């Protein structure tokens, strides 16, 4: 699957990230206008970002139009099925814990009722339709059509790589194996990015000086439609994204299951409850190994006494201890590391940068409720909720004000 997530492929998809970010910007502008014409209004940014990133993974991943940003009456069946299956109000069960250790179960919720079963059946059917359509196109034409992201959607790229003539038959993925990737792409490719961007807007709301500094840098780009290279050329935007993903990793922990006995060396000796000093850990086959992503990302021994503070400037000179963290990106464990690191980290990073580029240039953000009202619920992905109204589910209301109104106000006062 690696060819579908390389830098060249993500460069092709950047237009989708930017176009959907602009669509979200315009939707927020329209939403603010409906709030009695006030200069600023409240928006649940988590809900909107979740819909935007679902649209992106549908279009960039499968050439499928979720239309999640559109009005409810335009919602399609796959959007409804996805919302049903991945509801944040799912109950815990034994399968919940088994998913932590078995990747094949991780993104497949337990079917508790007829509605969930019907939703899963819809996802399977539409997934097969997408799969068969892409396969037929490749088999009959021998090449990808220039429509639909110029043939660069992830499913088409995955099938193209899988059907390459130089791939031995025993290394090819079966249709069932390819189909099984679709729920994983949908969940991992949309929940994590929307949550990460939500925490970014939260951090910027709490730190207006950082928000202003970022907006000043973003304003140096003269177009509303930046390329991937232009997004990656902005050092403070990169620092903000790094700091958000360090302090607020969407997935706070993970687990691995050992398939054979192994030895884990320790960088610092550990003394157990019996007083025995260990310089390494012997791990038996079948042992779950807990990976404390959030704890490592906030460890004062690595990041200093201000490790809990949101300070993008720390990335101008990262601490020496961070260089030893074996993450696939950014000297942190947010995207894990090694051969089972997050395969879509480039996808997520560029999408997040496109969102912040578009939204921070267009709006000013402030907390919509006192900071102490905002709690964190963690079930695979950590999301915000309001302590005063937990029954309402995950949300993050922010005060949102068009930035242009601030400029016009200053010009008016000057004259």
PLM feature spans:
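Short, small-residue alpha-helix embedded
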Residues: 192-205, 355
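Conserved cytochrome P450 catalytic core segment spanning the I/J/K helices
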Residues: 118-196
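Cytochrome P450 I-helix active-site segment
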Residues: 18, 39, 77-80, 84, ...
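Cytochrome P450 heme-binding "Cys pocket" and the immediately downstream C-terminal segment
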Residues: 30, 208-211, 321, 328, ...
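Conserved cytochrome P450 K-helix/beta-meander segment immediately N-terminal to the heme-binding cysteine loop
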Residues: 250-253, 273, 290-322
């Amino acid at each position: 699957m690696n060819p579908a997530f390389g830098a060249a492929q993500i460069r092709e998809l950047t237009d989708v990230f930017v176009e959907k970010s602009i669509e979200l910007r315009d939707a927020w502008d329209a939403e603010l206008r409906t709030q009695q014409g006030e200069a600023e209004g409240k928006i649940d940014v988590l809900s909107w970002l979740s819909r935007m990133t679902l649209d992106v993974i549908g279009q960039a991943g499968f050439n499928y139009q979720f239309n999640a940003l559109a009005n409810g009456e335009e919602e399609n069946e796959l959007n409804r099925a996805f919302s049903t299956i991945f509801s944040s109000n799912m109950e815990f069960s034994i399968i919940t814990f088994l998913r932590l250790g078995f990747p094949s179960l991780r993104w497949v919720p337990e079917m508790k009722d007829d509605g969930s079963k019907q939703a899963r059946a819809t996802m399977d059917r539409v997934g097969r339709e997408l799969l068969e359509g892409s396969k037929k196109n490749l088999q009959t034409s021998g090449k990808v059509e220039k429509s639909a992201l110029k043939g660069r959607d992830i499913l088409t790229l995955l099938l193209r790589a899988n059907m390459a003539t130089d791939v031995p038959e025993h290394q090819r993925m079966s249709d069932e194996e390819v189909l099984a990737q679709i729920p994983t792409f949908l969940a991992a490719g949309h929940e994590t990015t929307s949550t990460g961007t939500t925490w970014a807007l939260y951090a910027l709301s709490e730190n207006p000086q950082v928000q202003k500094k970022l907006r000043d840098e973003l304003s140096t780009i003269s177009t509303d439609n930046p390329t991937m290279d232009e997004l990656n050329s902005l050092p403070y935007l990169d620092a903000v994204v790094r700091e958000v993903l360090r302090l607020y990793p969407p997935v706070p922990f993970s687990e691995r299951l050992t398939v054979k006995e192994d030895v884990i060396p320790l960088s610092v000796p550990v003394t157990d409850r019996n007083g025995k000093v260990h310089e390494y850990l012997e791990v038996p086959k079948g042992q779950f190994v807990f990976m404390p992503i959030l704890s490592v990302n906030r460890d004062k021994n690595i990041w200093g006494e201000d490790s809990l503070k949101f300070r993008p400037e720390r990335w101008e000179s990262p601490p020496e201890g961070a260089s030893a963290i074996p993450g696939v990106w950014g000297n942190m464990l947010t995207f894990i590391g090694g051969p089972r690191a997050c395969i879509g980290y480039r996808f997520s990073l560029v999408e997040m940068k496109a969102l912040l580029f578009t939204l921070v240039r267009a709006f000013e953000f402030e907390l919509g409720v006192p900071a102490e009202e905002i709690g964190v619920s963690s079930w695979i992905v950590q999301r915000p909720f309001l302590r005063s109204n937990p029954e309402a589910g995950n949300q993050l209301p922010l005060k949102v004000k068009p930035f242009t109104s601030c400029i016009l106000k200053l010009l008016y006062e000057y004259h």
